[in-house]
Amino acid sequence: MAPRPAMSHSSAFLLPSPSAAAAGADADGAAYALLVLNQRLPRFAPRLWDRAQVRVCADGGANRVFDGMPELFPGQDPDEVRRRYKPDVIKGDLDSVRPEVKEYYSNMGTQIVDESHDQDTTDLHKCVAFITENSAIPNKSNLCIFALGALGGRFDHEMGNINVLHLFPNNRIILLSDDCLIFLLPRTHTHNIHIERSIEGPHCGLIPIGAPSATTTTTGLQWNLDNTSMSFGGLISTSNIVREESTVVTITSDSDLIWTISLRHHS
């Protein structure tokens, strides 16, 4: 069997980097899109907004931007902050966005897309599909999508959002909250996760949500896995820790896994 290709991951997008933010891409050529769902904005929302080339609010996520962005800039004029952080698109069922918020952004040129006819997919699913199929990002081969507000709140919403990671396994999608981030590790690759200690860790986890794993091997963790099987009803790797001396965590598995790591609140 041919060796699997390696995939590298990094949370460096959470580090301050004005030059990269202005370009909408990192030095490695990664392009970013931002999705905002209907949960409280994390403290680093403006940083990711500035990095993104496309900003999409999923329905009630527009309320969160309208209300929450000025709260992240105390002392600044709220209307000026709202003008600065105007979403490109509001998309979804449009049953949660407040009428006055929808009108405000529509008058500023935001595209409003009513998807209320589609009751079979979540707002996150609709927005990811829009970004990957229809957005103005010219080269989507190295696209990374940040989803804010996908964690926290109702558990069924969280599970629906995690399911979207499995529905789009060939796209890099990162779900973020103030406390942690998660993303999918496709079984088609081995994975090298570069640890940014100033902003993340040490607590982490590897979870076989989609299907059991017969064999998973890791390096760089306090409790490494060595051809270990994982499944619900058996062992899953939660409350693990990135070793203090580790700069990279490596993971190889026969199953898709969810990686999660804590975020430091001073970042």
From Swiss-Prot:
GO molecular function: ATP binding; kinase activity; thiamine binding; thiamine diphosphokinase activity
CDD domains named among the record's database cross-references: TPK (cd07995)
SUPFAM superfamilies named in the record: Thiamin pyrophosphokinase, catalytic domain, Thiamin pyrophosphokinase, substrate-binding domain
Keywords: ATP-binding, Cytoplasm, Kinase, Nucleotide-binding, Transferase
Name by which UniProt lists this protein: Thiamine pyrophosphokinase 3
EC numbers: 2.7.6.2
Protein's UniProt keywords contain Kinase: yes
Enzyme class: transferase
Location of this chain's protein in the cell: Cytoplasm, Cytosol
Function: Catalyzes the phosphorylation of thiamine to thiamine pyrophosphate (TPP). TPP is an active cofactor for enzymes involved in glycolysis and energy production. Plant leaves require high levels of TPP for photosynthesis and carbohydrate metabolism.
Catalytic activity: thiamine + ATP = thiamine diphosphate + AMP + H(+)
Signal sequence, start to end: none
Pathway stated in the Swiss-Prot or TrEMBL entry: Cofactor biosynthesis; thiamine diphosphate biosynthesis; thiamine diphosphate from thiamine: step 1/1
GO biological process, alphabetically ordered: thiamine diphosphate biosynthetic process; thiamine metabolic process
Species of the source: Oryza sativa subsp. japonica
Cellular component annotations (GO), alphabetically ordered: cytosol
One Pfam family, short name: TPK_B1_binding
Membership in a protein family: Belongs to the thiamine pyrophosphokinase family.
